[in-house]
Amino acid sequence: MSYRKLQRTSSQRRALLRDLTTSLIVNGKIETTEARAKEVRSTADKMISLAKKGDLSARRKAAAFMRDVVADVKEDGDNVAVQTALQKLFSDLGPQYADRNGGYTRIYKTMPRRGDGAQMVVLELVD
């Protein structure tokens, strides 16, 4: 299995991919460098494929990888419903992509970064 090292140690690289994948699932799109986006694309596709399975084993594998962050807060009078990134993945994204076999993300190139000229892209989930 080949992958990009992204100038980081394995633990730093794993943490970076966890954070970017979780941000992509919570927000629907992220802006990052091209190399990072191409790596996050593969991990995000794996997470959405787990969400499509929807069983307990898939939920535990996804929970072991993703960060435990709040994705959405809904207030209905006195009731407050908090949805985590994992819940959003399995309740919203899994059913949304049930008929799609891969290719859940799209990459758009944008302007180079001002400081170092690195190629920036927008990675977003396909509707």
Curated annotation (Swiss-Prot):
One of its GO terms (molecular function) is structural constituent of ribosome. The keyword Nucleotidyltransferase does not apply. One of its GO terms (cellular component) is cytosolic large ribosomal subunit. Gene3D superfamilies: Ribosomal protein L17. InterPro entries: Ribosomal_bL17, Ribosomal_bL17_sf. Keywords: Ribonucleoprotein, Ribosomal protein. One of its GO terms (biological process) is translation. Belongs to the bacterial ribosomal protein bL17 family. Part of the 50S ribosomal subunit. Contacts protein L32. PANTHER family: LARGE RIBOSOMAL SUBUNIT PROTEIN BL17M (PTHR14413:SF16), RIBOSOMAL PROTEIN L17 (PTHR14413). This is Large ribosomal subunit protein bL17. It comes from Lactiplantibacillus plantarum (strain ATCC BAA-793 / NCIMB 8826 / WCFS1). The gene is rplQ.
